[in-house]
Amino acid sequence: MAVSAIASAAALGSAYGLSVDLRHRASQPSHQQATPEDWFERSTPRSPALVAQGRKAFLNSCAHCHGVDASGDEGPDLHELEGSDRYISRTILHGVKGEMPSFAKKLGSDDIVKLTAYLRSLK
Amino acid sequence: MDKDLWAKMHGATVHFPIALVLFSFTLDGAGYAFSKLAMRRGLHSAGYWSMLLGAAGTVPAVVSGLVMTKGVLLGHDTLRVHHLFAWPTFALIVGIAIWRALGRGSTNERPSLGYVVAVGIAAVLVSATGYWGGEMVVGR
């Protein structure tokens, strides 16, 4: 009987350990490689006001997948994103096939600018 | 890779523990209830192997489910209900299988009443787990 209980506990413990590992992996940044377009392009303005507006837009549209603190949930962690501002804008607009929906219909260009400013502020 | 691969794997693998645990309960239950039956030993032997295979089948079902949900242990709404049944069911089936495997006597020996009751509970729990899993697929 004791052996059965230990086996049950071990099974649940293994499932818990696997869960922790999977959640950690899911919170890592996306495997997609961005091109270094920031060498050639102007950066998005990043005033505190714009960042604050971006935070609002983020909470409305992005937090349910990326977490309220952008550290990842169903979607990856958005801190210290690689790639240019244009790459971020294009990802928000077009989505990532099989992973993230497009927000072209929901967000205007102003919203994208604010979101980009907010995401760039995340360290 | 197919983005729905793990969902499909989970959908495929869960049916093995569900069917085998229910089958094991039916066989051992029938063998226990009809103790004078000539094929009683055969029923218990089949019940034994069904339980062991059912327990082995819980592993790919649990792993594929965890990968599919990216490690979510409980979740919300219907998924939460599904998991509240799934985790005790997983633990119980593994424990029962180990209990039976390490038990004295041969595989076709009549198990204790406590064992049969435990398998019955596991059968109910695995059915409930499957029901709530199905609700997520076809429920409104």
Residue ranges and their predicted role:
Chain B
Residues 1-140:
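Polytopic transmembrane helical bundles with strong interfacial aromatic enrichment
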